[in-house]
Regions:
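Conserved HGGG/HGGXW glycine-rich cap/lid loop of the alpha/beta-hydrolase fold
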Residues: 12-67
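Active-site loop/oxyanion-hole signature of alpha/beta-hydrolase fold enzymes
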Residues: 50, 54-95, 99, 260
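Active-site loop->helix "elbow" adjoining a glycine-rich segment at hydrolase catalytic centers
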Residues: 36, 98-101
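Flexible "cap/lid" loop of the alpha/beta hydrolase fold
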Residues: 105-149
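Short beta-to-alpha linker loops that shape the active-site pocket of alpha/beta-hydrolase fold enzymes
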Residues: 59-64, 122, 244-247
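Conserved alpha/beta-hydrolase catalytic His-Asp/Glu region
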Residues: 151-190
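Conserved serine/cysteine hydrolase catalytic core
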Residues: 177-233, 242
């Protein structure tokens, strides 16, 4: 088992909490999803480290001790952290999950990457406004419901709505400690949900992306699979890896097959 090391780094744009597995391997940046954090990715990071990678998992803006006060949006702050870590570590490969996949795609043109691996990135701009209209409307209503609950002081209900749509485990089946942790993050989860929904991806972002592998599971929400399909239309050098029996939280819940897919995609 690869030992985890962590540190808080003061940068020119804020402070970043970084967790590291496998300090002797080739550097690989791994960006987490909303409502999670670096420690949740320990099993996946250990698998990647055992395969010879130094897995670097930053806490994105607002998570742990990471703060980027000057960013215009949360998503820009997440991308700034990804760019910084890839640059200082010399990483030539980046893996992103969900919101972390969006941040990774936005960061990619600013760093010298040989490979980008995205597990169900949140890419609303890749959806077809007509063909995916019902899915877009349902997601917008979910975000609005989350905001209403948060405004009324019902933090648990706000994050429960999110979990019931995007997580593989129903809210009632989560351990009490997990529900408490998620409830404490409600404001940040709502903010991330709103921020990711409003991102427009410039054409040059798509065209500048390095060779990219998109991974998706057959148990994920339909909108996640449609985002992957849309991204395939925009990315000039992309391949897709479907996984059977895997949902949107596969990097946390089905670490084995997800790790195998990531390792197969890495150079």
């Amino acid at each position: 088992m690869a030992a985890r090391q962590s540190e808080i780094v003061q940068t020119g744009f804020g402070q970043v909490e970084v967790h590291r597995w496998g300090p002797g391997g080739r550097p690989l940046v791994l960006l987490h999803a909303a409502a999670t954090g670096p420690k949740a990715y320990a099993p996946l990071a250990e698998r990647l480290a055992e395969a010879g990678w130094q897995c670097l998992v930053p806490a994105l803006h607002g998570y742990g001790n990471s703060r980027v006060p000057g960013a215009a949006t949360a998503v820009e702050a997440h991308a700034a952290i990804a760019i910084w870590l890839a640059e200082v570590s010399g990483a030539r490969a980046l893996v992103g999950h969900s919101m972390g996949g969006l941040a990774g795609l936005l960061a990619a043109p600013s760093v010298a990457l040989d490979r980008l691996v995205l597990f169900e990135p949140i890419l609303f701009d890749a959806l077809d406004p007509e063909a995916d209209a019902d899915l877009i409307a349902a997601e917008a209503e979910m975000a609005a419901e989350m905001q209403r609950h948060l405004a009324d002081g019902r933090d648990e209900d706000a994050v429960r709505v999110f979990v019931e749509v995007w997580n593989d485990t129903p809210w009632a089946d989560l351990p009490e400690a997990a529900r408490a942790r998620l409830t404490a993050q409600a404001a940040g989860v709502v903010a991330d949900t709103q921020a990711t929904g409003g991102v427009t991806i410039a054409p040059e972002i798509w065209t500048a992306a390095p060779p990219t592998t998109l991974i998706h599971g057959d148990r994920s929400p339909e909108i996640a699979r449609r985002m992957v399909a849309g991204a395939m239309r925009h990315l000039p050098r992309a391949a897709v890896t479907p996984l059977s029996g895997v949902g949107h939280m596969g990097p946390l819940m089905r670490t084995g097959p997800v790790a195998e897919a990531i390792l197969a995609a890495l150079p």
